[in-house]
Amino acid sequence: MSVVCVAWSSHVGALMSAASRPGMPSVRVLSSRMLEEPDGVERCLETMRSATALFVFRTTDALWDQLDEGIRLIGKTVPVVCVSYDPAAWALSSVPVETAQTAYRYLTYGGAENLGNLFRFLDALP
């Protein structure tokens, strides 16, 4: 099992690079573009269900609406951090808002060190 991160395709390369660095917890990075594939929503949900912690950088694209209920259900058993440019999407998080804010800062500041810290932070969530 691992931390699962679903993010915009523009972030995937940097996230995957940070996840492959020595000393990182097990991380699966998924591009939100997979949601556009015929079975993408179900494959994404299946991977998210295997997470020990879930980080979602949600867009306002209507495809995400199909994931919302699944994210809520996953949040009943594992920590879910959902961030977005739309503050309403943060309500999908199952963690305190301060936890989501910290994770969002790591992503926003970017760079290998901050993204590595994001993964370690997510991996340490209870």
Q: Where in the sequence are the language-model features?
A:
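An N-terminal assembly and electron-transfer interface module characteristic of large anaerobic redox
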Residues: 1-126
